[in-house]
């Protein structure tokens, strides 16, 4: 039996680890701190072991036919994937595909090995929802590339109860702060829309959720353009809006105004040091309290117009909450990762470097819904 090497047992990993062990897979859980790996597997029985992680120890253990899941910091992924290719092992990660990862595609195909990335929440479930909506639209009577097309996808990790700061951290805030310094590129009114500072592009965004109507704030992040082709928005389509972005509670931009001002001034090593200091301060003041539950909202919208009239308008919505056992974020990041692991082991995903697979999207979303996630498709024209 192929052995699964799960690298990293941080906060977002535990449900996926436990699911694979409970389903009878052979698993080695690697973590720099062995105690964390032991906590992640506490109370389980099966063919699993925990080990102290180092690249050297992992390399010595990895065998041809095995599979490695990298839930390590992003700068490890390519090294782990390259080691897998040289050993004859497959690879799964929830992170975005870096250019260096994409460059491994030819080598992976040559060796008949599969490297799957972007199979967490965002990126991951958002891709799957987009694929399902696009399949539905293409199969409809109203489909035509000449229609005006509009697409938006927003995801946010929130606290169950809104606080004055309009945000609570379930792990170190440094990543959130660094993201505020990242420019974005999207499509608006059929034109390229570049934003250097996220807070300059904040918009209200109202959703009709199971618990009622709620207005959030959203803004674009990263470069949305590579995902147009991935989702099927080809050059012959009349696409007016295409944006992937971040969702926050209403009032977030006001509550964070002072942080925006400071982040904008930070430069060089001193700026990086101040960012770490600011992160630690925010963690002290706004961490998710013990016993407090988190929340994840994900909304993917696709609509089309002909002669100025809407002819298709559907959304794939999810409003999920953590419980006493796991955070919603951990469930929704690591459970799809475990789906991808099983699909690779069954040979269901071809060789090469891939994001969340199109073919499995509907099935995996149905399985997540069956696990109790509040999610589904809304037809706004019905």
Regions found by a protein language model. Give the residues of each.
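Rossmann-fold cofactor-recognition segment
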Residues: 45-57
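Rossmann-fold NAD(P)-binding glycine/threonine-rich loop
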Residues: 95-115
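Conserved N-terminal Rossmann-fold NAD(P)-binding element of oxidoreductases
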Residues: 4-9
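NAD(P)-binding Rossmann-fold cofactor-contacting core
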Residues: 27-40
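C-terminal catalytic/substrate-binding lobe primarily of soluble NAD(P)-dependent oxidoreductases
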Residues: 136-382
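N-terminal Rossmann-like NAD(P) cofactor-binding module of classical short-chain dehydrogenase/reductase
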Residues: 66-71, 92-93
């Amino acid at each position: 039996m192929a052995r699964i090497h799960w690298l990293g047992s941080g906060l977002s990993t535990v449900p996926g680890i436990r699911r694979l062990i409970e389903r009878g897979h052979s698993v080695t859980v690697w973590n720099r701190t062995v105690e964390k790996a032991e906590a992640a597997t506490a109370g389980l029985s099966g063919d699993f072991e925990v080990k102290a992680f180092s690249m050297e120890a992992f390399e010595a253990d990895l065998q041809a036919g095995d599979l490695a899941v990298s839930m390590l910091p992003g700068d490890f992924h390519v090294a782990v994937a390259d080691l897998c290719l040289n050993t004859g092992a497959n690879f799964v990660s929830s992170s975005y595909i870096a250019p260096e990862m994409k460059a491994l595609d030819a080598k992976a195909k040559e060796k008949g090995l599969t490297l799957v990335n972007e199979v967490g929440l965002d990126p991951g479930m958002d891709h799957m929802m987009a694929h399902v909506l696009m399949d539905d639209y293409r199969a409809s009577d109203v489909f035509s590339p000449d229609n005006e097309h509009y697409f938006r996808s927003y995801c946010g990790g929130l606290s169950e109860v809104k606080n004055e700061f309009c945000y609570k951290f379930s792990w170190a805030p440094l990543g959130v702060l660094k993201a505020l310094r990242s420019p974005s590129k999207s499509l608006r009114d059929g034109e390229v829309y570049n934003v250097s500072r996220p807070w300059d592009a904040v918009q209200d965004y109202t959703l009709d959720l199971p618990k009622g109507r709620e207005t959030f704030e959203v803004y674009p992040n990263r470069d949305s353009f590579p995902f147009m082709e991935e989702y099927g928005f080809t050059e012959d389509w009349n696409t007016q809006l295409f944006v992937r972005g971040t969702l926050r509670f209403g009032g977030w931009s006001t509550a964070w105004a002072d942080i925006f001002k400071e982040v904008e001034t930070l430069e060089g090593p001193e700026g990086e040091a101040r960012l770490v200091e600011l992160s630690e301060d925010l963690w002290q003041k706004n961490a998710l309290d013990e016993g407090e539950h988190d929340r994840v909202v994900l909304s993917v919208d696709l609509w089309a117009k002909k002669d100025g009239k809407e002819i298709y308008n559907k959304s794939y919505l999810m409003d999920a909450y953590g419980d006493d056992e796991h955070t919603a974020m951990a469930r929704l990041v690591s459970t799809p990762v475990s789906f991808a692991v099983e699909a690779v082991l069954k040979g269901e995903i071809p060789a090469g470097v891939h994001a969340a697979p199109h073919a499995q999207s509907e099935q995996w979303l149905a399985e997540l819904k069956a696990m109790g996630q509040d999610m589904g498709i809304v037809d706004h024209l019905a």
